[in-house]
Amino acid sequence: MTDWADPDALDLSDGETFDSLLDRADTREKGHFFEFFAEGDELAHDPGLRLTHHGSEQWMGQTLNHDPAYWRADTARERDFEERPVHPDYLLACVMGITVEDLSEKGGYFLGRDDVTFHQPVTAGTPLSVTSTVVDTKTSSSRPQYGIVTWETEGRDRETGETLVSYRRTNMIPRREPAATDGGAVGEQDEDGPMLPDTPISPDGEYFEDFQAALERADTENAAVAYRHERGRTMDDQLVAGLPLATLNTARQHHNRDEMADSPSGDIVAYGDVTRSVALAHARSDEATYRERRFADEQFHDFVTLGDTVYGFTRVLDCDPDAGPERAGAVTFEHVAFNQDQTPVYSGRRTALIQRDT
């Protein structure tokens, strides 16, 4: 009987031998299929990253988020931070990255995220602890090989237990066995096209009063406060593969071109939080941001692949002068990221505190 533990029993440098053995070998799988998840299940993810200024600065630099409060201690103090914090986009990506191996490493489509709330500023050196709870599972009527799962996730300080960020996220997840389906219904189309405001208005400046004045003007002119941002960012290897891996996001669709060659996208795709962060950077470059408050109704509409360029568009929805400290007011925006073909790839509502012009 052959001792297959003997190093000389197989010549794995021989192409035919290795190919035959590889075809017969089982694959030790990572991640979970749709059937694994049940409503009410709570998953405690492996200990996550200890947040760093280097990681935050790398994320900010690559995504064009240049707010000096996250780069400079003196500006952070002027903005009423006790210490220079890490950027909230970096925090959110690190919390979500930790969850990927347990929730969505099998692949599937990131459908959206809601109720994103930043509970307090977070500083470098904070160690993360992350849990997710399954809040809903259902069959996809359009793609029977997938199910749809929604989780509520909380990122905490592992040492103090304080909640740092929380959100609700929905993904398509591959099934072990496709579900029976009728294919779903097709919605009716409006042949007359969409109703649009007479005129889009842009704020005259970057402060809270500028957004408030623009909304007041729009109300009298049957107009909307809506504008595009000048900058664009082309997706390169660092954005598509490097940043997800730096936040422990192991989803194959961001770094395995072989696996993705026969997928609908035909290539590796950008991590949704990278696309989102680039779009938000474009928006933040045209405002005097004081603090991020919350995000809602975040959706990802199409693939973003290597070589695509992401641009930003913003609509101002509301201004609240009584929210926040005396030096800022709350503005609610709708942000849209779109590509070089003017195809929307991300949208979401965001409420931020914007500095007053004082």
Swiss-Prot record:
Enzyme class: lyase
Catalytic activity field: (2R,3S)-beta-methylmalyl-CoA = 2-methylfumaryl-CoA + H2O
UniProt EC number: 4.2.1.148
GO MF term set: lyase activity
Its biological purpose: Involved in the methylaspartate cycle. Catalyzes the reversible hydration of mesaconyl-CoA (2-methylfumaryl-CoA) to yield beta-methylmalyl-CoA ((2R,3S)-beta-methylmalyl-CoA).
Protein name: Mesaconyl-CoA hydratase
NCBIfam families the UniProt entry points to: methfumCoahyd_Halo
Keyword terms, alphabetized: Lyase
Family, as annotated: Belongs to the enoyl-CoA hydratase/isomerase family.
Domain MaoC-like: 44-148
Species whose genome carries this gene: Haloarcula marismortui (strain ATCC 43049 / DSM 3752 / JCM 8966 / VKM B-1809)
InterPro entries per the UniProt record, alphabetical: HotDog_dom_sf, MC_hydratase, MC_hydratase_acr, MCH/BMMD
